[in-house]
């Protein structure tokens, strides 16, 4: 499942978005337990703001970009490749015993 770092936090003016991401986390865990006997794994990936055309439009001023970057301890915007690597890992044999997990790809945003 594709979720977001916002599935682990709250944020002003983003109540509905955060609520839907929290719901994905609950769905992921419930499905993981339900499908585990069939050896079907269910996980989610939770990226931070990712460098895409949509996000570039949202952070369209230096002030907005600076604010966003101040929230990411690693000091870099998430790349699509970062999200893809997390999904590939979770789908790989290396994650054979990983189910019900939420893999954060947030540069430390939620660690604060």
Give the location of each predicted region.
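Residue(s) in the substrate-gating loop at a strand-loop-helix junction
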Residues: 4
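Alpha-helical segment proximal to the catalytic Tyr-Lys
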Residues: 33-37, 96
